[in-house]
Design a protein with these regions (language model features):
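C-terminal lobe/tail of nucleotide-utilizing enzymes
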Residues: 108-183
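Switch II (G3) loop of P-loop NTPases
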Residues: 42, 46-70
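N-terminal phosphate/diphosphate-binding loop that engages ATP/GTP or pyrophosphate donors
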Residues: 1-40, 45-48
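Histidine-anchored nucleotide/phosphate-binding helix
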Residues: 75-83, 102-113
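Short, structured coil segments at secondary-structure junctions
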Residues: 8-9, 82, 86, 144-147
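Charged helix-capping and loop-helix junction motifs
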Residues: 69-78, 105-106, 134-139
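Structural motif
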Residues: 57-59, 91-93, 122
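Inter-motif core of Ras-like GTPase G domains
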Residues: 69-96
């Protein structure tokens, strides 16, 4: 992901932990026999980066409550830790299909339970031919969570050429590139 983001956007990317298998970080680290930094260590590194930049994006793998370290620390713990010292905006990236309403409501509920109000939702991989559930979810996600839908990113966006990506990305946030959906 880091190389793709950097090649498409030209943004500076720092990656502190890379694991070989596409699994929850704690699981992948255990399987590889490596230890990963504790959430508190990640928080300090993010603070160091945030002091020199206007915007910092922190991406996790597997979801808000997936363990990031052997102590049971999660992305939610990291976010709450950072929010104590820096302004934090949380954008929840969600799936398009059946089951996303449940997953998204659970994620938003967990954030709110820690005093973190999500800024918005982003559908992370919108199919070229969305089914009924996917189309309905565009309406239902903000309705059931009370959180606005900020963007719908098409499936395969990471495979675009950088100039194509830069030209298309604004349409993902203004809704002009979305398939029609039922209301």
């Amino acid at each position: 992901d880091a190389e793709v983001v950097q090649s498409l956007t030209g943004c500076t990317v720092e990656e502190w932990t890379r694991l070989d298998e596409p699994l929850a970080p704690d699981t992948a680290a255990r399987r590889e026999g490596v230890s990963i930094p504790r959430v508190a260590e990640h928080a300090e590194r993010v603070r160091g980066v945030a002091d020199d930049r206007e915007t910092v994006i922190v991406e996790g793998a597997g979801g808000l409550l997936v363990r990031l370290d052997t102590d049971g620390g999660t992305l939610l713990d990291l976010t709450a830790d950072l929010a104590r010292t820096h302004p934090v905006e949380v954008v929840v990236v969600v799936a398009a299909g059946l089951g996303t309403l449940n997953h998204t409501e659970l994620t938003v509920g967990a954030l709110r339970a820690r005093g973190l109000e999500p800024t918005g939702l982003v559908v992370g991989s919108w199919p070229t031919e969305p089914d009924l559930a996917e189309r309905c979810n565009l309406v239902d996600l903000p309705r059931v969570t009370g959180v606005p839908l900020l963007a719908v990113i098409p499936a395969g966006a990471g495979s675009m050429q950088p100039d194509e990506f830069v030209a298309a990305a604004p349409t993902w946030f203004d809704g002009t590139d979305r398939a029609e959906h039922p209301s």
